[in-house]
């Protein structure tokens, strides 16, 4: 049952929401539900306009969230993830710093989601 805190220079203040345990909604879906203005164009992992930076806030070890093939390809294309980071996520369960909000389904851990407000803007 994670708390997800959204922060961006385009927001007046940070906003924290509670994600229900077992919910399979993506960060983008949760943001839309709570009127948090993460930019997006396709919502399907093709355009990378919903690029976010994720910081883990728990004291427990961070868990990697499965990277989809589309997400891996787009993040590599943007040079926002390395082959080593992908391997660390898949083999050692170490989360990458950058994700696509439309592909990232939060687990049971508190995270800070930072976005610039510019589609595809690097954080």
From Swiss-Prot:
Note accompanying the cofactor annotation: Binds 1 [2Fe-2S] cluster.
Keyword list, A-Z: 2Fe-2S, Electron transport, Iron, Iron-sulfur, Metal-binding, Nitrogen fixation, Transport
Entry binding sites for [2Fe-2S] cluster: 42, 47, 50, 102
An example Gene Ontology molecular-function term: metal ion binding
Annotated Pfam families: Fer2 (PF00111)
2Fe-2S ferredoxin-type domain span: 2-119
GO biological process, one term: nitrogen fixation
Lineage: superkingdom: Bacteria
Reported cofactor(s): [2Fe-2S] cluster
Signal peptide: none
Stated role: Ferredoxins are iron-sulfur proteins that transfer electrons in a wide variety of metabolic reactions. This ferredoxin probably participates in nitrogen fixation.
Family named by the database record: Belongs to the 2Fe2S plant-type ferredoxin family.
Protein name as it appears in the record: Ferredoxin-5
Gene designation: fdxD
């Amino acid at each position: 049952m994670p708390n997800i805190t959204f922060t961006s220079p385009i927001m007046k203040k940070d906003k924290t929401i509670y994600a229900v345990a077992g919910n399979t909604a993506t960060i983008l879906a949760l943001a839309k539900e709570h009127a948090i203005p993460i930019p997006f164009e396709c919502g399907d992992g093709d355009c990378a306009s919903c690029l976010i930076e994720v910081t883990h806030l728990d004291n427990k070890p961070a868990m990697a969230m499965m990277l989809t093939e589309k997400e891996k390809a787009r993040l590599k294309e943007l040079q926002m993830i390395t082959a080593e980071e992908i391997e660390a996520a898949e083999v050692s369960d170490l989360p990458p710093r950058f994700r696509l909000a439309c592909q990232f389904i939060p687990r049971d851990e508190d995270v800070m989601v930072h976005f610039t407000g510019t589609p595809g803007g690097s954080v």
